[in-house]
Amino acid sequence: MEIGVFIPIGNNGWLLSENAPQYKPSFELNKEITLKAEKYGFDFVLSMIKLRGFGGKTEFWDHNLESFTLMSGLAAVTTRIKLFATAATLVMPPAIVARMASTIDSISNGRFGLNLVTGWQRPEYSQMGMWPGDEYFAKRYDYLGEYATVLRDLWETGKSDLKGEFFQMDDCRLSPRPQADMKVICAGSSTAGMEFSAQYADYNFCFGVGVNTPKAFAPAAERLQVATAKTGRDVSSFVLFMVIADETDEAARAKWESYKDGADQEAIAWLGVQGAADTKSGSDTNIRQMADSVSAVNINMGTLVGSYETIAKLLDEVPTVPGTGGVLLTFDDFVKGVEDFGTKIQPLMKCREHIKPMLEAAE
């Protein structure tokens, strides 16, 4: 099973809580996290894109770096780990993104891939006059399908002449093309999102579900397998979890309870309002899960809480779900979390025994 880190490109990571660590994003912070991840054999890191935050007392995600420029910097200081940037496709033309990706492919010597998002938070785009109207919610994966087609045309052939509803290419050219196969990620959970991933993506990210229920995402993985059976493509599910670990189960649980007690209700309310704005896509979108009141303090991602031994056992259950390729991890404290994972959790994981020779050779 592959393991990646969802690096904190926005302030405070993924905890909307006054009791959680408070910090601003920086290149140095993300470099430290990424170099630790590379040292301990993590397979990849991914950064999101967020153009407007949720406010509140913690100013949640009001402070964000830009994904491509961050990953280009990380590409220059790493040697092995794979790097994924996120394209805000509503404001970044596909031909430009294709060239940016090819450039980072050159910097990283073939270690770069791309996460495509449609854009679900209207104020991110309306603030700069680039929101296409709420009818976009119903067409966003049609838009993304054309977008991905242009990318693939340019990366694979160096040319695109796509004439679609959203994009009109006229002998559009790209050179140099990427030296490595450019992997594409999507995080679709709706029916339309799953169908997009089955047709265009190499990996589909889905949310873990609940607390210490590492296999509860299985229905999402099964839906993806049904979708890929229709396209005949091999697309793996990668699952998003937050790890809150400590020496004992009790100590880890105390941290989790404290984070919930300090929930930033103003920021959570903003998330709920934005989640309700999409009335076109149905009830199975990621944003609907993120805004659910059950655990909005960490946007309702699957949460693993416990001792280092407990976390290792829980993560070993994940790859037993058919169609699972890996996990994408966040931490309450990223620097300490990645260090503890590399030294105290991963060595106990049966599904990570294959990396031990690599780590021993690097010592």
Curated annotation (Swiss-Prot):
The residues that hold FMN are 49-50, 115, 124, 140-141, 190
* Molecular function via GO: alkanesulfonate monooxygenase activity; uracil oxygenase activity
Keywords, A to Z, come to:
Flavoprotein, FMN, Monooxygenase, NADP, Oxidoreductase
Under the heading CDD domains, the entry gives: Alkanesulfonate_monoxygenase
The EC code for this enzyme is 1.14.99.46
Reaction it catalyzes: uracil + FMNH2 + NADH + O2 = (Z)-3-ureidoacrylate + FMN + NAD(+) + H2O + H(+); thymine + FMNH2 + NADH + O2 = (Z)-2-methylureidoacrylate + FMN + NAD(+) + H2O + H(+)
Q: Name one Pfam family in it.
A: Bac_luciferase
Oxidoreductase: present as a keyword of the record?
yes
- One GO BP annotation of this record: nitrogen utilization
Tell me which Gene3D superfamilies the record gives.
Answer: Luciferase-like domain
Spell out the family assignment given in the record's similarity comment: Belongs to the NtaA/SnaA/DszA monooxygenase family. RutA subfamily.
As for what it does, the entry says: The FMN-N(5)-oxide reacts spontaneously with NADH to produce FMN. Requires the flavin reductase RutF to regenerate FMN in vivo.
HAMAP family (UniProt xref): RutA
Q: What is this protein called?
A: Pyrimidine monooxygenase RutA
Q: Which gene encodes it?
A: rutA
